[in-house]
UniProtKB/Swiss-Prot annotation:
Cell compartments where the protein resides: Cell inner membrane
Residues annotated as transmembrane: 20-40, 135-155, 177-197
NCBIfam families attached to this UniProt entry: 1_anti-phage_ZorA1 (NF041794), antiphage_ZorA_3 (NF033916)
Keyword Transmembrane recorded: yes
One of the protein's GO biological processes: defense response to virus
Protein's UniProt name: Zorya protein ZorA
Record's keyword terms, sorted: Antiviral defense, Cell inner membrane, Cell membrane, Membrane, Transmembrane, Transmembrane helix
Family membership: Belongs to the MotA family.
Originating gene: zorA
Summary of the knockout phenotype: When this gene is missing the Zorya system does not confer resistance to SECphi27 in E.coli.
Length: 729
């Protein structure tokens, strides 16, 4: 501790007036540095921004090319030249043709100038604001250190040994404290002055920088990307409408052209047919005339010579020739008769035989149709008569049964009367008959009872099987329910463990995400300027691609029109060939149609008659079968109806008892299931209450941590908002 005492002694051995003198000297030196390195530079920056703003406002009405040249010559300083080069690259020049030359008509801005002429580049870095904004705090700290140093010197000189020394020491202490507070007051005063000057100069710099960027933005209108996008959309819509109109006009023109071609082709075909028919007729007549004339000319002279030779010949020769000619002619006529005459007679006979066969076939078909109609009528009449006969027989049988019953009743009455008259013998005979009747009735009742017992046993077996199956299914369902409850409780426990693990992971991820968000905010601010330039390049590239695509679409439309013209020409040639084929096939179809119409009529009548005959035959067979079943059923139903009704009543009572037992069983099952579900709901509610309580505690912790993180983010966002507001200002 001796070295510490020596240090304190060395520090407190200074005279008290040296403390405020030292503080004043340090503060004065800091103030002079502030004036030279901050205030004068701030005034220089303010004057420079004023000069630039006035110069920019002065060239507002000049030509765009002159404006660019003036600004290039204006921004020659290093801190402004780089920013101006970047801003100049973001400008978009619009050209128009004037006297065969492209000239700049206007220049559009794609990004605000404040993004390039930033506050940090033009104000903060030249003025060293990050250092000088902390200078008032440093001076205040120097004043406080001087105050404490003066107190240390005064306390070191304080001597409390005697009352006289105490009074003198108090005076010295107060004087030393006064010196110390004097230096502290000087330091605090100058720190206030420096703070005011620093904030005032910084605000002025920001103000004139904002005016400078506003004047620079006023030279160039923005929104070029939106205008190009709107014009692009407009041009694409116009091209789409033009393509649609072109398509509609092409379709209508092609339709009209095809109709005109078809009509003209039809007219030309008719005209060609008429001309061909007339030419064929004329050429035929001319050919016949030429052939007849040629034959006449060629045979006239030989015949004349023959006639002359015949006339000059002798009478005997003429007679011989005449006889020979007569013989030749008779032989020739006989030969013709034997050849062509027999053939014609045979043909006539064959035609007559064919006509006769056709007539006989026609009469046969007519007779067949008449017979089939007669058969169908006879079958309908026979079936109607049979039905009437069956109904009459049923009525007669019923009347006979009624008469038999009446006769039986009358016989019973007479037998009763005879019983009363005859006495014991008749009573014994009647008793035997009644015993026989009762025995027969008991036998029938036993058979029916056995049948009903078998039926009831089958029903009981089916009911027991159904009950056993339902009990097995319910037991299986209860077991599966228990397994599901066990798995559910296991899942709830796993869910609680997962929730706790997820909460810890969420807390850790939330802390990491807050740090990541703060780092990402800084990165996004840096990437903002880069994205603006990339968007400008992307917009220009998109415009170029759209122009190329529009040109390709127009070329495709031209090629499509050429293809449609070629298709129309091919269609015209095909129409010529089709019209020729239609004329050839029309004759064939007419002949085939005339031959098939007669056959279709005959076959349709034949098929209708056959179908009617089949339908009538099936209807008659069905009616006969139904009548047979009806007769059998009426005979059996009369005997078994009453007994069947009694058996049904007994069976219904037993089924009601079975239903009551099943209802009681289902009520017991519902009670057991209700209790099980209540226990399950209580267990689930208890586990959920515990889980939710733990979850609320963990969520409260997480919310407190999240609130702290959100406050930090809010502070960061507020600082970012201040920076952005300064940039906008």
């Amino acid at each position: 501790m001796s070295w510490l005492n020596s240090v304190l002694l060395a520090l407190t051995s200074v005279q008290p007036y040296m403390v405020p003198a030292t503080v004043i000297g340090l503060v004065s030196f800091a103030f002079l540095c502030f004036i030279f390195f901050y205030f004068f530079r701030a005034v220089k920056i303010i004057n420079g921004l004023k000069k630039y703003t006035q110069s920019i406002n002065g060239i507002e009405n000049n030509e765009p090319g002159n404006q660019l040249q003036h600004l290039q010559s204006l921004f020659v300083q290093p801190e402004l030249k780089h920013a101006w080069n970047e801003f100049e690259e973001s400008l978009h020049s619009q050209y128009e043709l004037e006297d065969g030359e492209e000239k700049i008509v206007r220049i559009r801005a794609t990004a605000p100038s404040a993004s390039f002429f930033s506050e940090q580049q033009l104000v903060d870095i030249p003025l060293n604001t990050e250092f000088f904004k902390h200078l008032p705090g440093i001076l205040t700290g120097v004043g406080i250190i001087g105050t404490f140093y003066g107190l240390m010197i005064g306390l070191n000189h304080f001597d409390p040994s005697t009352p006289e020394q105490v009074s003198s020491s108090v005076n010295n202490l107060l004087r030393d404290v006064l010196y110390a507070f004097l230096g502290s007051a000087f330091a605090i005063t100058f720190s206030i002055l420096i703070t005011w000057l620093e904030k005032f100069c910084l605000a002025k710099c920001y103000k004139y920088l904002e005016k400078f960027t506003a004047a620079l933005d006023a030279l160039y209108d923005s929104g070029v990307g939106e205008e190009y996008l709107a014009s692009l959309v407009k041009s694409s819509n116009e091209s789409a409408t033009q393509a649609r109109h072109l398509k509609e006009s092409l379709v209508t023109d092609l339709r009209d052209m095809l109709l005109h071609l078809a009509n003209s082709q039809k007219v030309e075909n008719e005209r060609l047919a008429t001309t061909l028919s007339t030419t064929y007729r004329e050429t035929g007549q001319q050919f016949a005339e030429q052939v007849s004339g040629a034959i006449e000319n060629s045979l006239k002279s030989p015949l004349d010579k023959i006639a002359g030779a015949v006339q000059t010949a002798s009478g005997d020769q003429s007679g011989m020739v005449q006889n020979m000619l007569q013989d030749v002619l008779t032989a020739f006529m006989a030969k013709l008769d034997t050849t062509f005459g027999q053939q014609f007679t045979n043909l006539n006979e064959m035609m007559g035989q064919t006509v006769g066969a056709i007539q006989t076939m026609q009469t046969g078909f007519g007779a067949l149709l008449q017979d089939m109609r007669q058969v169908s009528d006879d079958s309908r009449q026979g079936s109607a008569q049979l039905i009437e006969q069956l109904l009459s027989e049923m009525k007669s049988g019923q009347q006979a049964m009624q008469a038999g019953m009446n006769d039986m009743l009358t016989s019973l009455q007479t037998s009763v009367a005879k019983i009363g008259a005859e006495g014991e013998g008749a009573g014994e005979r009647m008793a035997r008959q009644l015993e026989k009747m009762f025995a027969d009735s008991e036998a029938r009742e036993k058979a029916q009872a056995e049948h009903m017992t078998a039926f009831i046993e089958a029903i009981q077996n089916s009911v027991q099987q159904g009950q056993s199956a339902t009990m097995e299914k319910m037991a299986a369902s209860v077991e599966s329910l228990g397994e599901q409850l066990g798995s559910l409780f296991g899942q709830i426990d796993k869910g609680q463990q997962q929730i706790s693990a997820n909460q810890q992971a969420n807390q850790q991820s939330l802390h990491e995400q807050t740090q990541r968000v703060m780092s990402e905010v800084d990165d996004q601010i840096k990437q903002l300027v880069e994205t603006v330039a990339s968007q400008h390049q992307g917009t220009t590239e998109t415009l170029r691609l759209l122009a190329e695509q529009t040109n390709r679409q127009i070329q495709d439309m031209h090629t499509g029109a050429d293809k449609m013209r070629l298709a129309a020409e091919r269609f015209e040639h095909a129409g010529d060939r089709v019209s020729e084929a239609n004329h050839l096939t029309a004759d064939v179809l007419n002949k085939a149609q005339s031959a098939g119409s007669s056959l279709s009529l005959a076959t349709s009548e034949l098929t209708s008659v056959v179908a009617d005959y089949r339908n009538n035959r099936e209807a008659v067979s069905k009616s006969i079968a139904m009548l047979e079943l009806l007769a059998a059923n009426t005979q059996s139903e009369q005997t078994t109806r009453t007994q069947f009704i009694a058996d049904l009543k007994q069976h219904g009572e037993r089924l009601q008892s079975y239903n009551r037992e099943a209802q009681a069983f289902m009520e017991n099952v519902s009670d057991v299931l209700g209790k099980g579900f209540e226990d399950f709901s209580e267990g689930v509610s208890r586990s959920l209450d515990k889980t939710l309580g733990k979850l609320d505690v963990e969520m409260a912790k997480a919310s407190t941590l999240l609130a702290g993180s959100v406050e930090q983010i809010g502070e960061s966002v507020s600082e970012l908002d201040d920076v952005l507001s300064r940039v906008r200002a």
